[in-house]
C-alpha cells in the first residue's frame, strides 16, 4: 500500500511538472511560400542572396522577376550561347538595367513576356504588382480571355495561385514562387492533353 502511494505521488508530481512546463512545441510546418521556393531552388530556378537567403517576404522587383522566369521562357543552353545578343537586346532598348539582370531582361523582352515603360526605361527596381506577375505568366502560358485588370482572376481561375496570394500593391517573392510553381504545374498539365 505504501508503495502504491509513492507511485501515485510520483505520477501526480510528474503530471504537475508537465502541466507547468507546457506542451512541447512541434516543429513549425513550412509555409506554402517556403515549399514553392524550395521546389524552385531544387530545380535551379530560384537562388538566394550571397548568404543563400531567399527573402520570401520581400517585394519582388522587375529585374528579379526577369531573372526568375527567363530560364523557363527560353532554354538556358541557348541563352548561354547567345548571351551577348540578349545583353545587347537589353542595353539597346533600356538604359537603366543593372548588368546582373541584362541577359534575363533581354530574354524576357525579346520573347514578349515583359516590356519596358518607354523612353529607355525598364524600371528594374520597381516592385512587381500581382497583376504584372500574372500578366507575365499568362503570356508565357499563351492564355487568352483576360486583360491586365483581370489577370489575377484568370490566374486564380486556372489554379496558378490562390486568389489570396495575388492581392495588394506589390507581390512578395514567396507569393511569386507559388505563382511560378503553379504555372509550371499548369504547363505540365497542358502537355498531357
Listing of model-derived features with the role each one plays in the protein:
Residues 108:
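Histidine- and acidic-residue-rich, metal-dependent catalytic cores
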Residues 180-182:
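Extracellular, beta-strand-rich glycan-interacting domains
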Residues 2-36, 42-43, 47-66, 70-103, ...:
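Feature responds to low-complexity, polar/acidic, surface-exposed segments characteristic
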